[in-house]
């Protein structure tokens, strides 16, 4: 009899655990996917699959390089054949044409460089039909690509002029002294080196590793673009090289100040309008209504701002003048459009975030930091514990602005993948989905959401758990599947406690969710194949925020498992 009872208890325990499995988990554990063979595709089908996530990007790179090559070639041929420049060609040789052709490419790049960082302009453009043709979400990538082109052709221009200055010095018997004079006392020389210094200062602090190590340094040095554009405007106005025949160049001090400013004036005007708009938006009444300290050094800031409309998946630029007057940092909104406030979850990892958290009253060094708690409420609120009411520092908010995650409702199936604090873009989206399920006002194409969250430690689940619990409770149709993965090594005592508490339970011992926690890293092969099997034919959007390496892996799997009848469309956060 005891043997029967043991068997019956074990059977009920397994039944209880299985009842918590999501449809995708059941399919993956059934072994059905292990025997599925990859479909053989025709060349046309392979091309169509390649076009889904790679084609437009590769096409853009090709067009970008082609245009630059054409501009350089046009400039070189023009200056090589122009009759009025024969004397210059005789003095300097081919490096004269190279320098001038590189300058022409720089004109082209300088005309483009500011448009991608005009955030309001990009957000408005995302709402037009052009968004289906131009990938406005790649605005930062385009800005970086253009910047590297400016660096490359600036050095081509500089090195070519080194030879030109050497030729002048040699033909006038001035030696190395003459070479130095031409470089550092001539108008084109000293303005060029000033621009080059500003440019390299911006570039060297913008590379990913230095930028992440010290964002404040990146922020301040990037404003040397003002120096760059100012000297760019006068760099060509010194008329150091005159044409052989009229019309002759008119130098500074008489009638002209050059024409280089004409190339960046349009982007510069829009960017200036953006900065003015930022200051005007900052004048709207904005204040912090509540501050919540979460485990894992996460600070939640709830903000009230007049005249602000948001959409799920958007982000803002946040400034706290008490910490820094000039710095604006990007944070993804974790509040839903349906809520009467906007919120961000700020991970305290750098100087700026550490100082902001301190100013807000967060104390992460305390022993009771393993539970979420309210640490501050706006002093005008009389409905809370007086001990929590305080005068909170003033903040400025610029935005909100669009992002790739904003497109989550465009697809029939959406796969949301967040690693650690990278879950923040999906907090807003999941909340909005929850509101739409409970208070339906408009139809949406979205019918299924897979949310995958990968964390290293137990505390990472704490601050987000209440939202996930609310979603599970209301999601009677199982439209949202939650898959949590714990990647940290588990101590023996912790593992024992988990097994005891999880046995015969209808909730997970770690998260409190109905869906069980998975240990280790996700098997992306099985996950992508399972989603495709369950939903073909359909189109799934894959949205990710987290480490670059994992993003590259997911990008590869999106390409690998797209086929006729089912497409995985790749999307990633860009700030």
Label the model's feature ranges.
Residues 1-51, 485:
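Extended, low-complexity, polar regulatory segments
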Residues 3-10, 326, 344, 349-353, ...:
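Reductase modules of NAD(P)H-dependent flavoproteins
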Residues 43-280:
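Membrane-embedded alpha-helical bundles of multi-pass integral membrane proteins
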Residues 138-162, 226, 419-452:
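Classical protein tyrosine phosphatase
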Residues 233, 266, 270-318, 330:
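Membrane-proximal cytosolic interface modules of multi-pass membrane proteins
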Residues 299-303, 340-348:
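A generic structural motif
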Residues 329-335:
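Short beta-strand-centered aromatic/proline hotspots
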